[in-house]
């Protein structure tokens, strides 16, 4: 997508190519089904640098070699193509920003900021302060939107946290989506949104019809290179997305919400009633 509108009804900010489809595919299906305009902005759309040989880069590139190719150019070209296909299913626009995934970011002297798998879910590196500032400026220059959606940061992935922080600086009125598949880890949602702090937040449940859930599943299935990261295959993908929808329904029912008889799944977004932020770099 090369031409953009001046205004969108819904603007979703996605840390990686597949995050918004995984977390919000059902609600986007619903938005576009009634004629609302949607733009999905993928933050880490930059071409990986050649020659970076950290542990995590080597592991992921070996896994992706068959589906994405072995060169940085091939990897990003295929991932962008998957993104366009996924949101073509949902009839949403796509924009790729030119920021590096955390696994490719380095210090000025070339040392990886996040060299190992566990580092992606650890503490922020102070070197990412400049990334947050630059990303906030880029996000502030996006088209106007009726509603902006940011990742809540469930699971603690560095890129999700960077995206949230930058988005909070760029936009005044935002809602937060629950980051799937990290929501499936017991306690992960509570870690970023403690039960004791729920009074500071207001949740909204988006109920999904069978058609919307199927549309979401088809969208996520477009990320063929990533399926093995979270699922054993397409059948497992469909089953787990349905399981996630049932998790949200169960949570809504526990909170006293009336579940429509036609709902086969759900997604949930959150609005802040009071200031609540992720821990700072210094903490």
Spans of features found by a protein language model:
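Active-site donor-binding loop signature of nucleotide-sugar glycosyltransferases
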Residues: 43, 99, 179, 208-210
């Amino acid at each position: 997508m090369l031409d953009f509108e001046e205004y969108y009804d819904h603007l979703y900010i996605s840390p990686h190519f597949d995050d918004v489809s995984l977390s919000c595919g059902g609600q986007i299906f619903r938005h576009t089904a009634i004629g609302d305009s949607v733009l999905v902005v993928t933050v880490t759309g930059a071409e990986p640098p050649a020659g970076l040989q950290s542990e995590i880069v080597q592991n992921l590139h070996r896994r992706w070699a068959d589906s994405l190719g072995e060169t940085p150019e091939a990897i990003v070209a295929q991932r962008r193509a998957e993104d366009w296909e996924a949101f073509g299913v949902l009839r949403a626009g796509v924009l790729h920003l030119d920021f590096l995934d955390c696994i490719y970011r380095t210090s000025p002297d070339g040392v990886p900021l996040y060299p190992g798998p566990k580092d992606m879910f650890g503490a922020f590196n102070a070197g990412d302060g400049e990334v947050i500032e630059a990303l906030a400026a880029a996000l502030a220059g996006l088209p106007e939107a009726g509603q902006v959606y940011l990742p809540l940061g469930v699971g603690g992935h560095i890129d999700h946290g960077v995206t949230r922080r930058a988005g909070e600086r760029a936009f005044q009125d935002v809602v937060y989506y629950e980051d799937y598949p990290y929501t499936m880890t017991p306690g992960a949602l509570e870690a970023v949104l403690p039960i004791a702090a729920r009074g500071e937040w207001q949740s909204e449940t988006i109920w999904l019809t069978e058609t919307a859930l199927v549309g979401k599943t088809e969208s996520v299935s477009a990320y063929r290179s990533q399926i093995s990261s979270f699922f054993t295959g397409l059948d497992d993908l469909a089953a787990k997305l349905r399981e996630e929808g049932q998790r949200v329904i169960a949570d809504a029912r526990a909170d006293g919400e009336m579940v429509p008889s036609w709902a086969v799944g759900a997604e949930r977004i959150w609005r802040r009633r009071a200031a609540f932020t992720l821990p700072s770099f210094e903490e």
